Swiss-Prot record:
It is an enzyme of class 1 (oxidoreductase). Optimum pH is 7.8. Pfam families: PRISE (PF22917). It comes from Digitalis lanata (Grecian foxglove). Its EC number is 1.3.1.3. Homodimer. Optimum temperature is 40 degrees Celsius. Involved in cardenolide biosynthesis. Catalyzes the stereospecific conversion of progesterone to 5-beta-pregnane-3,20-dione. Can use progesterone, testosterone, 4-androstene-3,17-dione, cortisol and cortisone as substrates, but not pregnenolone, 21-OH-pregnenolone or isoprogesterone. NADPH could not be replaced by NADH. Keywords: NADP, Nucleotide-binding, Oxidoreductase. This is 3-oxo-Delta(4,5)-steroid 5-beta-reductase. The keyword Metal-binding does not apply. The keyword Cell cycle does not apply. One of its GO terms (molecular function) is nucleotide binding.
Amino acid sequence: MSWWWAGAIGAAKKRLEEDDAQPKHSSVALIVGVTGIIGNSLAEILPLADTPGGPWKVYGVARRTRPAWHEDNPINYVQCDISDPDDSQAKLSPLTDVTHVFYVTWANRSTEQENCEANSKMFRNVLDAVIPNCPNLKHISLQTGRKHYMGPFESYGKIESHDPPYTEDLPRLKYMNFYYDLEDIMLEEVEKKEGLTWSVHRPGNIFGFSPYSMMNLVGTLCVYAAICKHEGKVLRFTGCKAAWDGYSDCSDADLIAEHHIWAAVDPYAKNEAFNVSNGDVFKWKHFWKVLAEQFGVGCGEYEEGVDLKLQDLMKGKEPVWEEIVRENGLTPTKLKDVGIWWFGDVILGNECFLDSMNKSKEHGFLGFRNSKNAFISWIDKAKAYKIVP
């Protein structure tokens, strides 16, 4: 069974067991943001026996101590605050065998100006520690997203964005965007090392697993559904009519990880920016029923003339969540970490603008996901890791 499709159909993935003979590593990955929604998928896929470019040795960088739900991944965990240049140098510069950097993290601040400053500093700290100290460094893989074409969250509906479907050759918007800053920093830094290549990956709404992600839509909806179930309430739809009735798409976290790996090892994908999405479309009116069925809760409909927000419905629910965690023996979590209400409101409160996967296909990436199956599989994973009942 190829690694390429293992995530798509839920096949058992072959891992290198601790007592297996340790292979000579062909590639050494540095995943920056390893406990995030894409970092977690990369940490699962890179160590697989048949992952392209392998066998892979993997370093995973995150700010917090390693969580219990992440301990199964056979990686070298590096606790490091990349916003601190001294900590970045101390922790990352000794990793001299790194060949590939997968940068899949970000910091969320209150304004886009602050986002630009914070995220630029973090990215520079990593590259300043890695590029001069890793003689075999080959590739930097940077993840941004569809806001490249739409502008930052604070500008939604206030600025003129591109007409979808979005293609990678569209010009930058004339507005501040930390994605643009990160791309510029990367292009500047790769010039310092001959032969160093790069890729940029622009997913849409990500479906995946991580209790530590700041934009985990599936996890947020699972927590909302679990609270509705606990309180005996209907799962009301907290979004707009355009999201309920219109076409949406998503980007599966494992698919995005495969996309990163493909671009890192395939010569035809070097020095390019790519969209990455599942390749199909869905309507939230259908997925809402799926969500309700998975949690055994009554399914609501779009409510005309009612402005429903997750942030309002879930206000003050911390004691309820603590009770749910206690009664069901769940992994201890804080509601503010697993229920990202503002993000759910942004996604469900706006029309989804689609992208095009043609460039990825033309360069040789043919991966895809069935979004309904992916939605269910990520719900199942949240349950399996005891994040939700």
